[in-house]
């Protein structure tokens, strides 16, 4: 570290351009991930409406928690995009410095952004590879592994669930519900066609459908 070009096989300008291309590619991956999670969330919303109409309080709560997890995952992905934009700006600055000084320089901004990006599971492998290349080039210093960030996630999740369930149910049902119901008698938005409620689904099938939905969301967030 510090000796620019010590083990470099490519010119600095070529390295910076390659890093920028990889970052943009990962941004597209993140965009797809966000869209997939949001599409699945729409399905969850419809399931919450159905469960509310049937007075299935436990199902409403489980699905609301899934939505909280999904929205939290989407927020983290948007944050990762912001960090990637910071790295891209840093790469532009490196090219400007390279033209003047003839070598790459250390960047605290890039360092901070990369420290955050290597913790994002969806892009972790690529970001670790990039960080190693940037360390060799002297742009960033060696980063320590930080594995403690998500230790309190479960506890925070429970607290958030208690606070957010009512709000989410109110939001999904356009105000027809303010909290998880014990029995719903009020008309909800987008009512079922006549006769649809008469044929209630088998309980086991509903459980399987719920588990399948949870599994899909967990896969998208992983």
Swiss-Prot record:
Residues 151-222 are annotated as: Interaction with VPS4A. It is a lipid-anchor. This is Charged multivesicular body protein 3. It comes from Homo sapiens (Human). Transmembrane segments: none annotated. Changing residue 64 to D: Induces assembly with CHMP2A into helical tubes in vitro. A motif (MIT-interacting motif) lies at residues 201-211. The lineage of its organism: Eukaryota, Metazoa, Chordata, Craniata, Vertebrata. Residues 180-222 are annotated as: Disordered.
């Amino acid at each position: 570290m510090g000796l620019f070009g010590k083990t470099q096989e490519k010119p600095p300008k070529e390295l910076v351009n390659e890093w920028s291309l990889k970052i943009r590619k990962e941004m597209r991956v993140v965009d797809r991930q966000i869209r997939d999670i949001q599409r699945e969330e729409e399905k969850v919303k419809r399931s919450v409406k159905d469960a509310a109409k049937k007075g299935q309080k436990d199902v409403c709560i489980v699905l609301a928690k899934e939505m909280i997890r999904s929205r939290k995952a989407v927020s983290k992905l948007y944050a990762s995009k912001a960090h990637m934009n910071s790295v891209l700006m840093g790469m532009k600055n490196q090219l400007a410095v390279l033209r003047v000084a003839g070598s790459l320089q250390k960047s605290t901004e890039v360092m901070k952004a990369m420290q955050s990006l290597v913790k994002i599971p969806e892009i972790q492998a690529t970001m670790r590879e990039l960080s190693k290349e940037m360390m060799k080039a002297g742009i960033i210093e060696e980063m320590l592994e930080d594995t403690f960030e998500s230790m309190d996630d479960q506890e925070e999740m429970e607290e958030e669930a208690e606070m957010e369930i009512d709000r989410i149910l109110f939001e999904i049902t356009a105000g027809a519900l303010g909290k998880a119901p014990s029995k719903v008698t009020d008309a909800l938005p987008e009512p079922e066609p006549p006769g649809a409620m008469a044929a209630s689904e088998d309980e086991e099938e509903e459980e399987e459908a719920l588990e399948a939905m949870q599994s899909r969301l967990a896969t998208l967030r992983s």
